[in-house]
Regions:
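Low-complexity, Pro/Ser/Thr- and charge-rich linker/hinge segments at domain boundaries
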Residues: 160-184, 265-291
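Bacterial N-terminal signal peptides that target proteins for export
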Residues: 2-13
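C-terminal motif of bacterial Sec signal peptides marking the signal peptidase cleavage site
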Residues: 22-25
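Solvent-exposed, acidic/flexible segments
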Residues: 81, 85, 285-289, 299-303, ...
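Intrinsically disordered, low-complexity terminal regions enriched in Ser/Thr/Pro/Gly
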Residues: 27-228, 234-237
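A cross-family detector of function-defining hotspots
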Residues: 310-345, 350-395, 406-409, 413-425
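Edge beta-strands of extracellular beta-sandwich domains
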Residues: 150-159, 259-270
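Early exported N-terminus immediately downstream of N-terminal targeting peptides
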Residues: 273-324
Length: 425
């Protein structure tokens, strides 16, 4: 079986800087009924891809936060006396989720203006409070950049059935007063968590001890190892509800011994982009034999070995540039769309995305995705079916239905990469 791993620097040290995708992911867009979305996991289809999270701060009210990169918005001004500004329409709808039926219970639309009076900000955060009693809901949030004409819609699961589930916690980095909308944290950051519905409790922190392995190949008889609460070890806790995040997967909860809580994992700086040379060799494991990968990873000069791999695969440095750009662009897309309790490229969907690229079509239901490569009705088309798995660590976990028949397709695509050819649907 061939696997490969390689993480690219934004200004690629060997050849050419790849196009960075300054995006991140909180939950994947979902549909509540069978649908065939035009939306694929190709970042070039998105002008902006915000991250969104919901927080329950009291028994009868909640709040959502939206992060958007300023560089993804269009800032303009009517005349030279005005500040540059971006203008957004943000609307949301809340539906009850009972007995497999939906009922609209709340909807609002607001105008949001961000002014650049004090220079360019890296991110813009919008937040709004709304009334919400205990229960299970879905929430549709739509964002439109009025100056550019681009728009984005996302549906989230909103779970307020108890006080210790994931959306009862807000996560902050270092001394920031702005909450995080993603669960990927830079290694070495000080993490602080608040939970107003559990204000009288000291949070318990846990760390997952086993190594999170790469997913088995799509033709394997094995399934991915999903973290189990029994493999977490309890850390020392105090009233500060904070810790310094070392490498790994963490979990915080107000309910001792419960797997209801807030999970987060550490990443290198710049995530979901790939920037540092010590990251670059990991994703190429999908394309190499174990011996080849060990030769790269354990070498005193892994970059030179990695460069050699790409040049030998491509045949020339110019073709190697194309391979590198395509491969690491896909790594960044996987990190953007498929992050769960680990980096997106390490998930089932990330693995398929790196090797096969964006599918021709995606059929979605509330709890599944089917990726179709080729014409849907053709006998020659390839279908990958992913089932959503309920997990205390993430709301974005999809597991591939593996099949021995995928082996020839996988080996053909890996062989194409190793012979300097990239297929894009």
């Amino acid at each position: 079986m061939h696997f490969i791993q390689y993480n690219l620097v934004a200004r690629l040290t060997l050849f050419i800087g790849i196009v960075s995708v300054f995006l991140s992911n909180c939950t994947a867009p979902q549909k509540t009924a069978q649908s065939s979305d035009a939306m694929s996991y190709d970042s070039e289809e998105f002008v902006f891809y915000p991250t969104i999270c919901v927080y329950h701060y009291s028994d009868d009210s909640s709040q959502f936060y939206i992060d958007i990169f300023s560089s993804d918005l269009l800032y303009a001004r009517a005349n030279s006396n005005e500040d540059f500004s971006a203008e957004l329409d943000i609307s949301y709808k809340v539906f009850t989720q009972e007995n497999n039926t939906e009922k609209l219970i709340d909807s609002t639309k607001v105008r949001f203006i961000d002014r650049q009076s004090n220079g360019q900000k890296s991110k813009v955060q919008f937040t709004s409070k709304f009334k919400l009693l205990e229960g299970l809901y879905s929430m549709s949030i739509s964002i439109k950049d009025l100056r550019r004409g681009s728009s984005f819609t996302q549906t989230l699961k909103v779970d307020k059935r108890n006080k210790s589930s994931r959306q009862n916690y807000l996560l902050f980095r270092n001394s920031s007063t702005v909450p995080e909308t993603v669960n990927s944290i830079k290694k070495g950051d000080t993490i602080r968590i608040i939970s107003e519905r559990n204000s009288n409790s000291v949070l318990r922190f846990y760390k997952y001890l086993p190594e999170i392995k790469l997913p088995p190949a799509p033709f394997s008889s094995n399934s991915p190892d999903i973290p189990s609460f029994k493999d977490f070890v309890k850390l020392k806790s105090d009233s500060s509800n904070s810790l310094i995040a070392e490498e790994g997967l963490y979990f915080a909860t107000a309910a001792e011994g419960s797997d209801d809580g807030c999970a987060f994992f550490t990443v290198s700086g710049g995530y979901p982009t790939v920037r540092k040379i010590d990251q670059l060799h990991y994703p190429v494991r999908y394309l190499t034999t174990k011996a080849e990968f060990d030769d790269i990873a354990k070498n005193k000069f892994p970059k030179e070995k990695l460069d050699q791999f790409w040049i030998e695969s491509a045949g020339t440095k110019d073709r190697a540039r194309v391979l590198i750009s395509s491969f690491y662009h896909r790594v960044e897309e996987a990190n953007t769309f498929f992050s769960s309790y680990t980096e997106g490229w390490r998930t089932d969907r990330g693995m398929i995305h790196l090797v096969f690229g964006s599918p021709t079509k995606i059929n979605r239901t509330k709890n599944s995705e089917t990726w179709i490569y080729g014409e849907e009705e053709s006998n020659a088309s390839l279908h990958f079916h992913f089932q959503k798995i309920e997990s205390p660590w993430t709301d974005n976990l999809f597991v591939l239905n593996r099949d021995p028949l995928f082996k020839s397709h996988w080996e053909n695509r890996v062989s194409s990469w190793r012979n300097g050819r990239v297929y894009n649907n």
